[in-house]
């Protein structure tokens, strides 16, 4: 399972796998401003959160009924 999350109108993309490990980061050069590093950091975090949400939704869809009664958080 993999999912790609985006932020900033798709200028930052983060891909993660089913273990929530980041496997790829794509940055549009427009978002790389040495005077505003904080914005880039925030966009990367937002894209990662978006990807995690997509993975969690996919896991719920595929395994939610099977694991629902086990009390696993966020599932």
What do these predicted regions represent?
Residues 25-37:
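A short interface-forming secondary-structure element
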Residues 16-20, 31, 58, 62:
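Amphipathic, positively biased hydrophobic alpha-helical segments used for protein targeting
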Residues 1-4, 54-75:
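Long amphipathic alpha-helical segments used for membrane anchoring, targeting, substrate engagement
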Residues 43, 47-55:
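Stable alpha-helical structural segments in soluble proteins, enriched in small hydrophobic residues
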Residues 4-26:
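N-terminal intrinsically disordered, cationic/polar leader segments
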